[in-house]
Amino acid sequence: MELIEQVMIFVVILAAIASLVYAWWLRKGVLALPKGTEQMQKVWNGIREGALSYLNRQLKTIIPILAVLSVLLFFTVYITHPERGTLELFGNDPTGIATAQFMVGIGRSVAFILGAGFSLIVGQLGMRIAVESNIRVAQATREGEDRYNRALTISYRGGTFTGMLTDGLGLLGGTVIFIIYGIAAPDALLGFGLGGTLLALFMRVGGGIYTKAADVGADLVGKVEQGLPEDDPRNAAVVA
């Protein structure tokens, strides 16, 4: 590896670490803010319990699927041949090809788990900080002349936390794989990208189902218990 490549890898790792440190700083700043009145916290606790129950149920469902897919991904290297750079690294003879297939299969499966794990961390922590920041945004709008600016700042920090965490973990994972595999990294990075995007898709679909169920439940409560028509603005759940 040439000097310029080593320098650029070092810079990328520093950028990844800086993103993670910035995300931690944003989270710490949000959690240090007041959570509002007792009544606000009572409502917020219900939202928080619902979000955490969804995250825990999602985790129990996803982990077995990831285990099966990681094993299947190992055997994909025997269906499609490794890249040219991989063969240059391990050799183009039968022994080299067999070694390349085995090493790439291992790397692809491990990278898949790594990408899925990073995506899971982002989803879990991102959801939690979103719940934590919501009540603090509501509290910020209740006091002071600059309340809307402060509320917007809290919203920005809560959302940016997830973005910085995604960037930092993505850069860090991709760079580590590149350092280990060198010119054979594209074959292993396939698993890393697939793990991250596949888990994000699962979480996106699962979150949509969960929120739709909450929406239907809120409509039923408004109709049955309060006698309100569907999508009535007097139902707070409709506004939410």
Predicted regions and their residues:
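Hydrophobic, small-residue-rich transmembrane alpha-helices and their short perimembrane loops
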Residues: 2-240
